[in-house]
Amino acid sequence: MGARASVLSGGKLDAWEKIRLRPGGKKKYRLKHLVWASRELERFALNPGLLETGEGCQQIMEQLQSTLKTGSEEIKSLYNTVATLYCVHQRIDVKDTKEALDKIEEIQNKSRQKTQQAAAAQQAAAATKNSSSVSQNYPIVQNAQGQMIHQAISPRTLNAWVKVIEEKAFSPEVIPMFSALSEGATPQDLNMMLNIVGGHQAAMQMLKDTINEEAADWDRVHPVHAGPIPPGQMREPRGSDIAGTTSTLQEQIGWMTSNPPIPVGDIYKRWIILGLNKIVRMYSPVSILDIRQGPKEPFRDYVDRFFKTLRAEQATQEVKNWMTETLLVQNANPDCKTILKALGPGATLEEMMTACQGVGGPSHKARVLAEAMSQATNSTAAIMMQRGNFKGQKRIKCFNCGKEGHLARNCRAPRKKGCWKCGKEGHQMKDCTERQANFLRENLAFPQGKAREFPSEQTRANSPTSRELRVWGGDKTLSETGAERQGIVSFSFPQITLWQRPVVTVRVGGQLKEALLDTGADDTVLEEINLPGKWKPKMIGGIGGFIKVRQYDQILIEICGKKAIGTILVGPTPVNIIGRNMLTQIGCTLNFPISPIETVPVKLKPGMDGPRVKQWPLTEEKIKALTEICKDMEKEGKILKIGPENPYNTPVFAIKKKDSTKWRKLVNFRELNKRTQDFWEVQLGIPHPAGLKKKKSVTVLDVGDAYFSVPLDEDFRKYTAFTIPSINNETPGIRYQYNVLPQGWKGSPAIFQSSMTKILEPFRTKNPEIVIYQYMDDLYVGSDLEIGQHRTKIEELREHLLKWGFTTPDKKHQKEPPFLWMGYELHPDKWTVQPIQLPDKESWTVNDIQKLVGKLNWASQIYPGIKVKQLCKLLRGAKALTDIVPLTAEAELELAENREILKEPVHGVYYDPSKDLIAEIQKQGQGQWTYQIYQEQYKNLKTGKYARIKSAHTNDVKQLTEAVQKIAQESIVIWGKTPKFRLPIQKETWEAWWTEYWQATWIPEWEFVNTPPLVKLWYQLETEPIVGAETFYVDGAANRETKKGKAGYVTDRGRQKVVSLTETTNQKTELQAIHLALQDSGSEVNIVTDSQYALGIIQAQPDKSESEIVNQIIEQLIQKDKVYLSWVPAHKGIGGNEQVDKLVSSGIRKVLFLDGIDKAQEEHEKYHSNWRAMASDFNLPPIVAKEIVASCDKCQLKGEAMHGQVDCSPGIWQLDCTHLEGKIIIVAVHVASGYIEAEVIPAETGQETAYFILKLAGRWPVKVVHTDNGSNFTSAAVKAACWWANIKQEFGIPYNPQSQGVVESMNKELKKIIGQVREQAEHLKTAVQMAVFIHNFKRKGGIGGYSAGERIIDMIATDIQTKELQKQITKIQNFRVYYRDNRDPIWKGPAKLLWKGEGAVVIQDNSDIKVVPRRKAKIIRDYGKQMAGDDCVAGGQDED
């Protein structure tokens, strides 16, 4: 039965069926396992034919072995099956799969040992690479001398990485893609990968933070060994070495290849992946548990969402496998879940998706119900049919195999791919437009009611690759209808395409049957049918194993009008099969009419239809020109005439070709382009001559009529319809559609590039010494062959292209230099851009300047020093293309300088891979930079300019780093490596900038070159507050409606200033306030702002800005000696900030609280905070906060809890147990503050209670616990715990709950909050902790207007301070004071010292309390004896 069953024959099949699947198991290998393995190999794009030999199996195992560690269970099963099959082929006697795997491992070990021995004997470089200690992956390889060398990461890899980030952003797929692309990379390579995506600053900052944390952890775990490093021994890497910031490439290679190795690349990669995981979690916050299939959601869409989320989950592969096996089925909708459970636990994903195809929604339910009802009423129907009531009632039929009598879900046959209704792949049954199942229709072989014809040679060039089954000598009637309609002579035999299953109606023994024409089957097998004559029993190998059949000989069968006599087997086959024994008799052949180019299938965007744009009127000469052009195109088969049945239309027009009287046809495909699917551009950019290697022989070819040589998808052609109108509507318009790729259609470039690559691939493989650069229809062909041999190869290439329908006209075949290619002029040893002529005009339009800038940009890649900034300034604003623009003096000067530069021709040289790349950058001023990339001084590979300003506020160092990144990225694309940079900036300046500013942990290798003007930082901010300098608290406020605002400052020295502003914003006022502070301060100043916006601008140390106020701030900063800038959060009661905020807010901030309403509502939905907490946290008026609480249905149960209780000693706690949902919750309340601690305990025992009290005492200062008389509180365990923790235990009055009033009321409050959040948590213990959090930190009120959490901390802190103060007071009372009053020179006293300050003391003399300056007081210790007289206050007792 087919090719897959013929992998083993004879004795090998017997041996195969004796091998057990598991050691000691009952199940053995069967033929179905080979069929499964063949299908799996096809799925993984491996040739199933390899299974037929031992060598083939060995090749498959080599391919699969590398994927075993990370692969799915299916891959492992496939490997096991192939390993067992290999043993059968090699006649190795094995009893089960495990024994087969052991044998394979033994063979591989022996083979490896032999290889290593051979390598040791020969000492060959190639053999050395097989050593396990050497990385066989890039970028560290071993050269012929045995040295470890670094092979740079390829530009293709880097381009792939850039595209991954651009396409996927930071979705879960990024992590496996990064892991695969960075296999074996060094830290330098990894940093290169990070650098080229450095534009994603937020993500890179997160990544940097993770790397820094991991590096710090590494340093802590791996401390530096004391003493010097022994000679010849490498130092141990630090965290920053692993991150590549403080280590050289050679050091990294040394660590990675030492014995034992330190895999710094893998360690750094692991850190990066940790960071990427955090980024992915931020971008994809959905949990796998939340992925559930919607009631009508297709199973395929659900699976896509499931696996996308699964990739983002942080779990091991085993856990992910478990999630796939369990959650995928568990979270499916009920309809799919029923089917999936019926499939059993071992079902593959493909089987699940096939089984669940078309499931879901009302149509599916109706169908299932109809099938169930038809099954239930079968017997009744049979009785009624006998009576003649229901003649010809339809029996139920299986969607899967087409047989009657059972349902698809009960079908034993293998699940059929494609739609269960029409048999076609590419859609599900629920989306099928056919009314009945196609694979049971009599005319399936000829779906359009006509036969396929052999295409003519011209048509074949433009038709899709097709595979057809032809039955020779059939009757004419089947094909003539279609032939007559199209007016084409057809062959007389039917042709059956293989785009669908080739099912035809055959007549056997006078009965009609649907049967599959199977050229892979030896025998003809039919399901149960009554045939005349004798039969013999027989066993045949089928798809599901062996089946028993009856063999009838010499049976007449009629297929497509042809008769044959042969053997027919009758048995329980899932599908009727006509095998080769009958097909050969009727002359049936399998034909492969290969069209030169396979068409690429194209579709419209989902839910869209083709364009229906009316044709606009055309002049007579344009209509005539278009008619002639279309006649020629029709003759060449490029377009096809169509009738009115095509409803689509796209407008067409004509323009005259440049410098010619000939016309050119243009079709406006703008509308079709909007509706066509998106395409992936196969080529990311154009090749650059600087990246070409110098070649002896070069040829440049052009492909003629490039697009018109590639066929368009047949199903899509109808959408390209256009109409050529007639003059004065004399006749209906002539309608055409394209057979080939149209000019101007969005899909043409991508499809052409893809087709061209496929066509050139065999030539490139056959001739590796020839380099072909391909961009659209331009081909550059270079080689180091002699010119004669080279030209022979060129002719071979032209013939190869011609076979595929591509012509290379002699007119554009360039054999001698200079070669004109892609806008460049190529010479044997140099290149330049094609000559550029700058126009000289009296007046310039916008269009003229745009073209001029384009030419200058093109020239800048080899002419150094080109500038366009002033010319670009002329184009600012929305201007029409024809508007006249006067040139400014600066623009005229810039244009004149550019003319001078372009006067002398400049050439670039070609790339030499053996030499280093060097990039040198010079500053041109006004934010413009020029650079040269060379390998030898004064021989530039290419030049360029950089003038892009990425932000409104910048400085030269920042622009220089952006230019470096741009040049590095450009170099990676062209040469696959970064150059060494020579920059006009001193190391000290660079370091000062980079230590403070953000970096992606990678700075390219560079050196200082003294090329004026040098880059410098014009000012530097201090990192610590300046001692002795005045501190300015600055703030600004603006009203959004009136645009009025205020800016001002207050200082720590009592100064303050406020200015009123008009037409301003909050951000401008914040900057204006900083400017005021800088204006009014001395040479050194501390400034404190609450604006992150202003802080961000100034901390980046800009030296130029588009904002006038920022430029004024920069001028002030340059004049200062020292400036310290700090930030504090706004509205948090911070001294000076609060004062200046009140100062600038008066009369301005009226509606600013509206900003906080949304955030407050969001927080209330999560925590159900009370109105005081929201008013405080979000700056809301009480009425607004109360309204939010009033609109919440969960907060309206019993009103809001009353707050405010007696201020008791801060050491007293009340404890109680309460019950909820059948569980016990123990609650402890801090009486003074209302702060609670609670948790669910397993039992109300003394042991659990004692443990809770000890936990409480470990967190807070507990002096007294007040409890009721419950047995758990009066237990010995609790008494022991209280004794140990020095806690006094008090008991309430029996049967009087009021003695436990505080904790009782808190129990009610806690249960109320639990009720509000219960649905957010799965378990009660989680809800309890959520409720504790909300009560302690999200509810404010009572003493001080604090939350309970703030209040307990404040009370404990106050208690400590009070005790400390009390100690100080006690000490102070041991002193006496003698003092002089006013101008009286007589000392008085002794008085009692109450308080001692910096400038004065407070004393009590008799009953009077006085304040005396320190200079007029003498403080002495009281020794218990009274001083004798007023003048006896001698110095020995003096305190100061």
Swiss-Prot record:
| Domain named RNase H type-1: residues | 1026-1149
Motif, Tryptophan repeat motif: chain positions: 990-1006
Q: Covalent lipidation (N-myristoyl glycine) residues?
A: 2
Q: Which residues bind Mg(2+) 1?
A: 702, 777-778
Ranges for region Interaction with Gp41: 7-31
Q: Where is the active site?
A: 518 (for protease activity)
- Zinc finger annotations (Integrase-type) as residue ranges: 1155-1196
Annotated cofactor note:
Binds 2 magnesium ions for reverse transcriptase polymerase activity.
Q: Which GO terms of the cellular component aspect does the record hold? A: host cell; host cell nucleus; host cell plasma membrane; host multivesicular body; membrane; viral nucleocapsid; virion membrane
Question: Which residue intervals make up region (Interaction with human PPIA/CYPA and NUP153)?
Answer: 195-233
Q: Quick one: where's region Interaction with membrane phosphatidylinositol 4,5-bisphosphate and RNA? A: 14-33
Q: What SUPFAM superfamilies does its record include?
A: Acid proteases (SSF50630), DNA-binding domain of retroviral integrase (SSF50122), DNA/RNA polymerases (SSF56672), N-terminal Zn binding domain of HIV integrase (SSF46919), Retroviral matrix proteins (SSF47836), Retrovirus capsid dimerization domain-like (SSF47353), Retrovirus capsid protein, N-terminal core domain (SSF47943), Retrovirus zinc finger-like domains (SSF57756)
Q: Where's DNA bound on this chain?
A: 1375-1422
| ZnF CCHC-type span | 396-413, 417-434
* Domain Peptidase A2 positions: 513-582
Which molecular-function annotations from GO does this UniProt entry contain?
Answer: aspartic-type endopeptidase activity; DNA binding; DNA-directed DNA polymerase activity; exoribonuclease H activity; lipid binding; RNA stem-loop binding; RNA-directed DNA polymerase activity; RNA-DNA hybrid ribonuclease activity
Write one Pfam family the protein is assigned to: RVT_thumb
Which residue intervals define the domain Reverse transcriptase in the entry? 636-826
- Which InterPro entries does the UniProt record give? Aspartic_peptidase_AS, DNA/RNA_pol_sf, Gag_p24_C, Integrase-like_N, Integrase_C_dom_sf_retrovir, Integrase_C_retrovir, Integrase_cat-core, Integrase_Zn-bd_dom_N
Q: What else is known?
A: HIV-1 lineages are divided in three main groups, M (for Major), O (for Outlier), and N (for New, or Non-M, Non-O). The vast majority of strains found worldwide belong to the group M. Group O seems to be endemic to and largely confined to Cameroon and neighboring countries in West Central Africa, where these viruses represent a small minority of HIV-1 strains. The group N is represented by a limited number of isolates from Cameroonian persons. The group M is further subdivided in 9 clades or subtypes (A to D, F to H, J and K). Resistance to inhibitors associated with mutations are observed both in viral protease and in reverse transcriptase. Most of the time, single mutations confer only a modest reduction in drug susceptibility. Combination of several mutations is usually required to develop a high-level drug resistance. These mutations are predominantly found in clade B viruses and not in other genotypes. They are listed in the clade B representative isolate HXB2 (AC P04585).
> What is the protein name stated in its UniProt record?
Gag-Pol polyprotein
Species lineage = Viruses, Riboviria, Pararnavirae, Artverviricota, Revtraviricetes
